């Protein structure tokens, strides 16, 4: 070590060390998340979450390793550490020695070794039949008509598939129009598009309650009618899960066009990632039409339907047929690394959105990666328009495999042959909570987000409100519920989906009994966590964007200041999407959690009955 520094960059012990080999120079490596056990003498024992390997290091070394959670080359880690820790400036050889020692100990994750483990495994391509397509609609017959026209043009209706229109319309006239659309479309295109509206739903609900009287309350909550002022997005999706049980299921929102739109720059690579989607911005509403894929117009063919249920090596063979290069791990969080195994299966497939991304907030525009945000702020006039107009390509440029299901698209594939949870039938963010619950039931399950999009063009013009990004995060019921479940996921030792589904019901019964004080504490904790996370991310983005135009930098600084100011104000005491005063909101939340728990207890029996009796 150089004598000018007191930084203790050395080891005390190495336990279970591997042979003395350095990582290949082209490899990408990252420090494994470790359990840390403080010792005396400024030392800490580490045990790797992924490898189970152990070592003892000085606390200074541990601090340095905490800077190595991103997958980078050895040289990139070295340069980053010298920049992040001034005491290490000029100590290239010492840094390399320590990182190589950590690699030999088994606590550095290797992209090359993982890629070898996940080598593609060729599999027979399945015919795109035996699928269940469910269109979900509510009081939008014009949108349904437009969607069906695009399906007639771009989709091959195979006799082995089943097709449903699940109608949640409240107005009788719209119900009649949708039923007529199904009948006329079926006649004209020689396909059985089944209308599944209030009458059909009521019929099946009655039969379910008669067959399963002990679960009557749970069935009514998940599948029954609610007051007209309630948003029941999840209710329609529960009917889709039941109709599609035992099949590959495709969920389609009514306000999309059934066609495939490619990104301007499309890759043929696959990646394992923890990152969010890319964004591309357009100056006019119809520019995307030049990106339509005329040769493969159906967004649900190829890997979208074919990858459902496949193991990761099989899905890689289907997507690209090539072994993952080290760069494919660049955006992977080490915490997710161990979830990508040969036995991991794709349970969810999705594609991006062209037009309206479907998000109520636009704060994520300031959290985009470098390439996307450069496109965002390239022109001031267009930048100002992008803050309000929902007209962008939002998706992937690669075949992106994820172990998180935080964003599910307007066209979603679900492997309903597996045990799945029901959606929460009320409120928004039903897909966010569903994704977290799928991950809870199947910890090694994957989502494949595909490198194309479908046009999402609501008939009504939607715009983001001015100043929306400056508003501090506030929880709705289901986003908060997803947060609470995420904290429990790693602590459940059960290995079977059935047992984990039972524990889900217990989890929501426990939430239903939470005290006011504890609920207020958790609301404050999650709000502060989101706010401070946004502040950190935006501050880092601002620091790494000195070349960005002043108008964007000023706006980003104003958002950071607004979020910092919100830290001095009282935390929310209720839920933004439940009416009433905060006490009423908390009481309502507890009642809804209790009702959902009864539904979770009923769900497995409902699914089994529907498969036998539909």
Kindly label every feature range from the protein language model.
Residues 1-67, 604:
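Acidic, low-complexity/disordered tracts enriched in E/D and polar residues
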Residues 132-140, 154, 166-168:
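A conserved hydrophobic helix/loop-capping motif in glycosyltransferases and polysaccharide synthases
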Residues 27-30, 34-39, 107-120, 124-125, ...:
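Long, compositionally biased intrinsically disordered regions
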Residues 272-406, 410:
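Extended catalytic-interface subdomain
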Residues 438-454:
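Catalytic donor-sugar/metal-binding loop of nucleotide-sugar-dependent glycosyltransferases
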Residues 149-160, 184-185:
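Short, acidic, metal-binding catalytic loop of nucleotide-sugar glycosyltransferases
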Residues 2-7, 42, 50-127:
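Long, charge-rich, low-complexity alpha-helical segments
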């Amino acid at each position: 070590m150089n004598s000018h520094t007191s930084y203790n960059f050395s080891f005390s012990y190495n336990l279970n060390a591997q042979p003395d080999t350095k990582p290949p120079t082209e490899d990408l490596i990252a420090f494994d998340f470790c359990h840390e056990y403080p010792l005396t003498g400024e030392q800490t024992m580490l045990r790797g979450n992924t490898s189970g390997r152990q070592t003892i290091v000085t606390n200074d070394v541990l601090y340095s390793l905490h800077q190595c959670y991103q997958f980078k080359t050895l040289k990139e880690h070295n340069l980053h550490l010298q920049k992040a820790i001034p005491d290490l400036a000029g100590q290239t050889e010492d840094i390399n020695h320590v990182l190589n020692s950590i690699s030999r100990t088994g606590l550095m994750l290797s992209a090359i070794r993982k890629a070898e483990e996940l080598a593609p495994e060729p599999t027979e391509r399945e015919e795109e039949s035996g699928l269940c397509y469910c269109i979900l609609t509510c009081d939008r017959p014009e949108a349904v008509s437009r969607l069906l026209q695009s399906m007639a043009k771009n989709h091959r209706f195979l006799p082995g598939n089943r097709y449903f229109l699940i109608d949640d319309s409240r107005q009788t006239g719209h119900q009649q129009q949708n039923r007529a659309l199904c009948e006329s479309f079926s006649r004209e295109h020689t396909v059985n598009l089944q209308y599944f509206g209030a009458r059909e739903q009521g019929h099946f609900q009655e039969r379910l309650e008669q067959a399963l009287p002990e679960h009557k309350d749970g069935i009514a909550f998940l599948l029954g009618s609610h007051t007209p002022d309630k948003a029941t997005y999840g209710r329609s999706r529960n009917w889709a899960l039941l109709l599609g049980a035992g099949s590959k299921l495709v969920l389609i929102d009514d306000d999309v066009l059934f066609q495939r739109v490619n990104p301007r720059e499309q890759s043929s690579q696959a990646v394992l990632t923890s990152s969010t989607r890319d964004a591309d911005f357009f100056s006019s509403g119809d520019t995307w039409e030049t990106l339509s894929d005329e040769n493969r117009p159906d967004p649900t063919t190829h890997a979208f339907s074919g990858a459902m249920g496949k193991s990761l090596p099989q899905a890689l063979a289907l997507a690209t047929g090539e072994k993952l290069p080290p760069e494919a791990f660049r955006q992977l969080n080490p915490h997710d690394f161990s979830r990508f195994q040969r036995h991991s299966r794709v349970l969810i497939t999705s594609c991006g959105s062209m037009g309206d991304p479907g998000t109520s907030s636009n704060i994520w525009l300031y959290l985009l990666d470098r390439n996307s945000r450069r496109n965002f702020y390239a022109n001031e006039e267009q930048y100002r328009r992008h803050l309000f107009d929902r007209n962008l390509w939002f998706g992937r440029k690669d075949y992106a495999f994820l172990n998180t299901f935080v964003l599910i698209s307007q066209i979603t594939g679900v492997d309903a042959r597996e045990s799945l949870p029901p959606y929460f039938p009320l409120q928004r963010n039903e897909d966010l909570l569903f994704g977290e619950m799928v991950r809870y039931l199947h910890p090694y399950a994957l989502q494949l987000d595909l490198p194309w999009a479908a046009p999402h063009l609501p008939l009504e013009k939607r715009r983001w409100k001015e100043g929306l990004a400056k508003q501090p995060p506030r929880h709705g019921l289901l986003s908060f519920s997803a947060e609470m479940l995420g904290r429990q996921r790693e602590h459940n030792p059960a290995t079977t989906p059935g047992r984990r589904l039972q524990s889900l019901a217990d989890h929501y019964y426990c939430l239903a009994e939470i005290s006011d004080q504890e609920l207020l504490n958790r609301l404050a904790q999650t709000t502060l966590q989101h706010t401070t996370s946004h502040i950190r991310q935006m501050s880092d983005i601002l620091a790494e964007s000195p070349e960005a135009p002043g108008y964007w930098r000023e706006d980003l600084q104003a958002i950071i200041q607004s979020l910092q100011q919100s830290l001095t104000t009282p935390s929310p005491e209720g839920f933004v999407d439940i009416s009433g005063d905060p006490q009423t909101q908390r009481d309502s939340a507890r009642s809804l959690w209790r009702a959902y728990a009864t539904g979770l207890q009923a769900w497995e029996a409902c699914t089994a009955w529907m498969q036998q009796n539909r």
